[in-house]
């Protein structure tokens, strides 16, 4: 069932006759939804920018960013984004030195909410992943996601329908590669319908040189090398973004920060092995869900690996409903490749 709340969350309406629905969530990114409805007084009154779309079955929630009335087709099209994007309504206005990623991210969010309504932060999981990073400036979600990517930590904004609040959470999913609850997506086992396998190394880099400037009289330039690959398997990138040592940083701390920047860059520029499959709509959310690590096997193509479910896409149209999963890093489009490598 799809429910649409008004902007101030005081009222909601059920949407039961959508012409088409596309909803997608990602493990550590902003997802989106596109919903097409017939134009009638009920739907017109239900839709407003800033309202919340909630799928009660798949536990997905989105904030409406825009909508369009088309009188020729007699439709209204709603465009929405996953509610973690609400954090980008706030900027990081004070310098934050991060060591433990989970507690550091929590502190950055808490100290920058500044009255953002109906948003809470979930409890700590006890993750021990560490970093050497300084967050200052930029939008909150955009700035924390690279650190989460390096540590393979997901983020989501869970909708608490009883209290009508958004709860921001960090999570890692379950390891479902072994034991009685193991999950295997395999063409041979008939558990990988519409299988697409992709291997993309177009942006792959495993060694990064990060240039920075010391805070001394001569403004000495330094370069920190991150990565240990050698020979033909070494793929290098030069990263110069005017990184400067802060007044309160020692040179050792600055070098550690540059190293962390290099690690985050390597985490983005990966060799992308991807399984894309269609699944039984009844299995998602019970047998496995976003963030879980599962096995992917294709004897015919010689592929066997453990992959995280990084994206889920639900589609409803005239042909019926289906769910597609992306396991592993999604393959880039040409535009995505340009954005990633700069």
Tell me the role of every PLM-derived stretch.
Residues 26, 35, 80, 94-120, ...:
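Amphipathic, non-transmembrane alpha-helical segments in extracytoplasmic/periplasmic proteins
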Residues 1-16, 178:
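Polar/acidic, low-complexity leader/linker segments enriched in S/T/G and N/D
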Residues 68-87, 123-205:
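Short beta-strand-centered interaction patches in the first periplasmic/extracellular domains
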Residues 17-43, 189-342:
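An acidic/polar, Gly/Ser/Thr-rich interaction patch typically located in mid-to-C-terminal regions
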Residues 41-121:
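Surface-exposed cap/loop segments at beta↔alpha junctions
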Residues 1-7, 168, 207-212, 294:
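Short polybasic amphipathic segments
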Residues 88-94, 179-183, 322, 336-340:
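Short, charged, solvent-exposed linker or helix-capping segments at domain edges/interfaces
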């Amino acid at each position: 069932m799809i429910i649409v709340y008004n902007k101030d969350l005081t009222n909601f309406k059920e949407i039961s006759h959508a012409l088409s629905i596309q909803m997608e969530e990602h493990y550590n990114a902003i997802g989106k939804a596109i919903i097409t409805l017939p134009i009638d007084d009920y739907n017109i009154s239900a839709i407003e920018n800033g309202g919340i779309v909630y799928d009660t079955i798949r536990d997905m929630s989105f904030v409406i960013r825009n909508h369009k009335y088309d009188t020729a087709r007699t439709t209204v099209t709603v465009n929405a984004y996953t509610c973690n994007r609400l954090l980008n309504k706030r900027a990081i206005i004070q310098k934050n030195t991060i060591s433990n990623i989970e507690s550091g991210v929590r502190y950055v969010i808490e100290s920058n909410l500044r009255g953002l309504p109906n948003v809470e932060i979930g409890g700590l999981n006890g993750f021990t992943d560490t970093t050497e990073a300084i967050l200052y400036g930029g939008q909150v979600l955009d700035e924390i996601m690279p650190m989460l990517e390096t540590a393979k930590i997901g983020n989501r904004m869970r909708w608490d329908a009883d209290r009508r609040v958004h709860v921001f959470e960090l999570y890692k999913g379950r390891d479902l590669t072994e034991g009685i609850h193991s999950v295997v997506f395999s063409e041979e086992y008939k558990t990988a319908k519409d299988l697409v396998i992709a291997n993309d190394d177009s942006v792959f880099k495993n060694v990064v040189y990060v240039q920075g400037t010391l805070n001394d009289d001569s403004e000495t330039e330094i370069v920190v090398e991150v990565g240990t690959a050698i020979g033909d398997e070494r793929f290098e990138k030069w990263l110069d973004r005017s990184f400067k040592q802060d007044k309160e940083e020692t040179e050792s701390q600055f070098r550690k920060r540059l190293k962390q920047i290099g690690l985050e860059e390597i985490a983005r520029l990966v060799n992308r092995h991807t399984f894309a499959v269609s699944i039984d709509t009844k299995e998602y959310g019970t047998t496995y869900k976003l963030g879980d690590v599962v096995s992917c096997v294709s004897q015919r193509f010689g592929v066997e690996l453990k992959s995280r479910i990084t994206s889920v896409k639900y589609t409803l149209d005239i042909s019926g409903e289906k769910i597609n999963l992306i396991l592993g890093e999604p393959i880039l489009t040409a535009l995505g490749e340009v954005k990633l490598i700069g």
